Amino acid sequence: MSQQHDYVIGKNAVIETLKSDRKLYKLWMAENTVKGQAQQVIELAKKQGITIQYVPRKKLDQMVTGQHQGVVAQVAAYEYAELDDLYKAAEEKNEQPFFLILDELEDPHNLGSIMRTADAVGAHGIVIPKRRAVGLTTTVAKASTGAIEHIPVARVTNLARTLEEMKERGIWVVGTDASAREDFRNMDGNMPLALVIGSEGKGMGRLVKEKCDFLIKLPMAGKVTSLNASVAAGLLMYEVYRKRNPVGE
């Protein structure tokens, strides 16, 4: 990224940043923000020797957009992982790889929400394309409520080629498509898996779709014909979690 820093906004996101290894340059809090989670921010900052600058809330409104909850931190720019980092994350846990592939996802709130769920289910990383897709931004960080500090995100030039390379390394590529015949509940979540989620409006691109080993669908029993990308991703991720972590074992 060209810029040297980003902003983290919101109490949860800043707390997770303070707990992580990310370099934090400055920390601002709105005057009289001392209750609840704000107190945890203050204690963590004190423990790390970080000085808090107390400013009028209007000052924070001018600095960033979005609901900052009276807490803003300036941090080192978000760094993208390498693909090998994702494999390493699976290897360190002695687990079969489980990756999320996001094909031209544009909504930062969707990306942040997917990151949050991916961390919750123990996925080993997310892959996004460099072009025509949202990257790691302040809005994404806020929507992830701190998951951005824990889930590695790799950014690649050619998503279809990356999927081909994954297949060569033994990963099964499963795409989501409304026209697919296979119900998502029949998916084998125990195999080395890359789950592809298409963009909000168009779904998966043709080249990406052609690289999939299987296509699955989410059955729709009501009147609507599609789900929000982050909702669909969440359902699919927890299906993989359910298969890998049977109740009672």
UniProtKB/Swiss-Prot annotation:
Binding site for S-adenosyl-L-methionine: G198, L218, L227
Record keyword Iron-sulfur present: no
SMART domains: SpoU_sub_bind
Protein name, entry field: Putative TrmH family tRNA/rRNA methyltransferase YacO
Organism whose genome encodes this protein: Bacillus subtilis (strain 168)
NCBIfam families linked: rRNA_methyl_3 (TIGR00186)
Protein's UniProt keywords contain Transferase: yes
Documented EC number(s): 2.1.1.-
Domain of life: Bacteria
Keywords on record: Methyltransferase, Transferase
High-level lineage: Bacteria, Bacillati, Bacillota, Bacilli, Bacillales
InterPro entries (UniProt xref): Alpha/beta_knot_MTases, Ribosomal_eL30-like_sf, rRNA_MeTrfase_TrmH, SpoU_MeTrfase, SpoU_subst-bd, tRNA_m1G_MTases_N
GO cellular component labels: cytosol
One GO molecular-function entry: RNA methyltransferase activity
Pfam families linked: SpoU_methylase, SpoU_sub_bind
Entry's family note: Belongs to the class IV-like SAM-binding methyltransferase superfamily. RNA methyltransferase TrmH family.
GO biological process, one term: methylation
PANTHER family assigned to the protein according to its UniProt record, in alphabetical order: 23S RRNA (GUANOSINE-2'-O-)-METHYLTRANSFERASE RLMB (PTHR46429:SF1)
